């Protein structure tokens, strides 16, 4: 065994350890001998303890996500002629949208029966639980409200904002990794990770797969924008973001472990799963609508027939 550094080691994990955790079906395909040096992740999610107060890696990552998103948003709106005051005002709308939308999304997308039976538990933020699809819904509503307030189209604001989301969302997945949550399914790949605070099963580092989606989507958006296909405000950038990001989310979700997800137990979702013959994550179900919305926005933008070179005439 190599010495641990910040709780990270690489060591052989006997398959019998995995079997003892009740994952026999998941690890049956592994050999009965030792696993080939998986990474063992055993980092304390708390960075600093100050009496009853704690500073967690997730909280730091959440702050970095907000800072990154605002920096990209501010740079873009200034580049396209909006004022600094305009950019800063959105901060007062966007931050509550992220927190409220993310929390409500987690409560009612993943455990609706629990929170409908006891609605006050929604406010128990210290118990954790923020859903990215809820964040997306909250931001979409906020962009609409902000566009009405400032007499600017929703598609223009969304084209400003989409790259900011793409580049900042990865920080949340880093926080998930430090928390040893949103873990992957059992795996025998060379980069498998044992999340020792969860169990001793080598798994896909699904958080890191999700992490890669954001920068990749950001690069796609830059490429689309630089090709001068349609002007900012056509909705092409926002549509491309929704289609690429959530399309990749549907793909990556298959590597995540399954949990008790009440939405999947409700009709018609359970009936569709039974008809298809394979399980579908709640995250996959929730990603379908954004992908369809993105495809609609792309089609609408492409039918507009206006090129980016005409932006000067359509910007305001």
Task: Give each language-model segment a name.
Residues 2-3, 12, 16-29:
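Low-acidity, Ser/Thr- and Arg-rich intrinsically disordered low-complexity segments
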Residues 3-4, 22, 38, 301:
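Absolute N-terminal positional cue centered near the fourth residue
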Residues 29-316:
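Hydrophobic, membrane-interfacing alpha helices
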